[in-house]
């Protein structure tokens, strides 16, 4: 959330900056004025509460004097009761006003960084850079790693390897259900182990996160729309929890309420988060329906960093650089794009996506999102840094950044399309030592069903 002082001119804030940011996001500008008005109403209630406390103290003293003098104090006792009832009403109104004010502030997004493209259309995402393996020029439907024709979609390659079973998965789980089998399991575990080893070698602390969170904690790190579109709820009697959509959520709360008093020595803190993740994908009906690219349950390796505010943009570049190095080591062509202002989630001041090339589908698809959330999350979670200096008016919060390293099922999909051959799959060299037998190649062992995706695509061209 933003600091309330940022909305108030009298506190050194500039509401016009927030309004301009809201406009870039395509969100409500009027909300800023509503927050300012509600803050003033809350201040008035606080003033009324203070005044009632003063009056109550004064009346209580007078009652004491009357009792001491053995004089009648019925009128003062009646006045005290009246003031106490009024105070109770004011406390209730103040609590409700505070709740409503915080709720509205939480609806306002982070201040969009000046370098972000101002647009509501993701077609205007900024192309930052591209990378391809040496001697690969992205010819039509050619697998990047093997040079063979990319005749099959990722899910068809996995079917021919007997690497997953979607039919039984759907029968048991429902929409987008699946079982990984055989080398599907080994590939997934290889990516998990390689990803953790990769980040560990760069100084990240591996952290396996819990997959459920209390509602009150989740509310501090996930925005309201995620509760409706993304998160699964788990209810046990009156106990209400949410399954995580990313390990960023529990890891962001890992240091909640803590204070890094010596930031130069204690920060940055870098975590390599690992967890299973769960997403309803409520707004993605019919999108990426093939295979295991977009599913309800998956595994993910996440970068999460806490840093000093002055160093967060340097850390942002470092984190996207780590993800790029990871995909370069896998030999997967990709591009990095800067996300337009209208597509940023509330917490992000700026976001880069890494989109890898899928040769069968002839398109780039998102594998990584890297965001600098500045102090938007840490303010809600009260993660502070530095020793408060004399005359310092504002609290200083750490900056929080997150970046996917690998959502492993998605990464597998990209490997399957780029490492396929006519008779099987070449295993990326960096993954081989994590797979039993350290195979260089896995042959196909199953035939595809009739009228599968590649057949339909071929018919469509004829």
Swiss-Prot record:
GO cellular component: cytoplasm; cytosol
PANTHER family (UniProt xref): SERYL-TRNA SYNTHETASE (PTHR11778)
GO molecular function: ATP binding; serine-tRNA ligase activity; tRNA binding
Catalytic activity: tRNA(Ser) + L-serine + ATP = L-seryl-tRNA(Ser) + AMP + diphosphate + H(+)
Protein name in the entry: Serine--tRNA ligase, cytoplasmic
Any single Pfam family the record assigns to this protein: Seryl_tRNA_N
Enzyme class: ligase
Summary of the function given for this chain in its UniProt record: Catalyzes the attachment of serine to tRNA(Ser) in a two-step reaction: serine is first activated by ATP to form Ser-AMP and then transferred to the acceptor end of tRNA(Ser).
EC number annotated for this UniProt entry: 6.1.1.11
Binding of L-serine, residues: 246-248, 302, 404
Keywords: Aminoacyl-tRNA synthetase, ATP-binding, Cytoplasm, Ligase, Nucleotide-binding, Protein biosynthesis
Location within or outside the cell: Cytoplasm, Cytosol
Binding site for ATP: 279-281, 295, 366-369
InterPro entries in the cross-refs: aa-tRNA-synt_IIb, aa-tRNA-synth_II, aa-tRNA-synth_II/BPL/LPL, Ser-tRNA-ligase_type_1, Ser-tRNA-synth_1_N, SerRS_1_N_sf, SerRS_core, tRNA-bd_arm
SS bond list: none
Organism domain of life: Eukaryota
Any Gene Ontology biological process: cytoplasmic translation
Record's subunit section: Homodimer. The tRNA molecule binds across the dimer.
Cross-referenced CDD domains: SerRS_core
Domains (record comment): Consists of two distinct domains, a catalytic core and a N-terminal extension that is involved in tRNA binding.
Family: Belongs to the class-II aminoacyl-tRNA synthetase family. Type-1 seryl-tRNA synthetase subfamily.
Primary location recorded for the protein, binned into one broad class: cytoplasm
């Amino acid at each position: 959330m933003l600091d309330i002082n940022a909305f108030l001119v009298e506190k050194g804030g500039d509401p016009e900056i927030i309004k301009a940011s809201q406009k870039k996001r395509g969100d409500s500008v009027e909300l800023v004025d509503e927050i300012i008005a509600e803050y003033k109403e809350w201040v008035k209630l606080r003033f009324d509460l203070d005044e009632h406390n003063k009056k109550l103290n004064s009346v209580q003293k007078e009652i004491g004097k009357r009792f001491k003098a053995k004089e009648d104090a019925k009128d003062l006792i009646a006045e005290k009761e009246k003031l106490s009832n009024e105070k109770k009403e004011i406390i209730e109104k103040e609590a409700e006003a505070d709740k409503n004010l915080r709720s509205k502030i939480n609806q306002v997004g982070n201040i969009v960084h000046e370098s972000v493209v101002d647009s509501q259309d993701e077609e205007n995402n900024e192309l930052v850079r591209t990378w391809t393996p040496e001697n690969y020029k992205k010819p039509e439907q050619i697998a990047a790693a093997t040079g063979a024709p990319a005749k099959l979609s990722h899910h068809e390659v996995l079917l021919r390897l007997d690497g997953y079973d979607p039919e039984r998965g759907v029968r048991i789980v429902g929409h987008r259900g699946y079982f990984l089998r055989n080398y599907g399991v080994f590939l997934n575990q290889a990516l998990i182990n390689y990803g953790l080893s990769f980040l560990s070698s760069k100084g990240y602390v591996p952290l396996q996160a819990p997959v459920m969170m209390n509602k009150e904690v989740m509310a501090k790190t996930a925005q309201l729309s995620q509760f409706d579109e993304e998160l699964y709820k788990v209810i046990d009697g009156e106990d209400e929890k949410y399954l995580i959509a990313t390990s960023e959520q529990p890891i962001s709360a890992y240091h909640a309420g803590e204070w890094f008093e010596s930031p130069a020595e204690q920060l940055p803190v870098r975590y390599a988060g690992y967890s299973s993740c769960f997403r309803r994908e409520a707004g993605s009906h019919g999108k990426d329906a093939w295979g295991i690219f977009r599913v309800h349950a998956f595994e993910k390796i996440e970068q999460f960093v806490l840093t000093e505010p002055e160093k967060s943009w340097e850390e942002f570049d470092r984190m996207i650089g780590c993800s790029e190095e990871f995909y370069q080591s896998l030999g997967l062509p990709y591009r990095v794009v800067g996300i337009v202002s209208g597509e940023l989630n509330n917490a992000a001041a700026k976001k880069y996506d890494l989109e890898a090339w899928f040769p069968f589908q002839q398109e780039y698809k998102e594998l990584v999102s890297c965001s600098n959330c500045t102090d938007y999350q840490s303010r809600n979670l009260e993660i502070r840094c530095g020793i408060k200096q004399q005359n310092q008016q504002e609290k200083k919060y750490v900056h929080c950044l997150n970046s996917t390293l690998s959502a492993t099922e998605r990464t597998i999909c990209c490997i399957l399309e780029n490492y396929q051959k006519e008779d099987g799959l070449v295993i990326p060299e960096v993954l081989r030592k994590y797979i039993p037998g350290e195979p260089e190649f896995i042959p196909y062992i199953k035939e595809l069903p009739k009228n599968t995706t590649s057949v339909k695509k071929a018919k469509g061209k004829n």
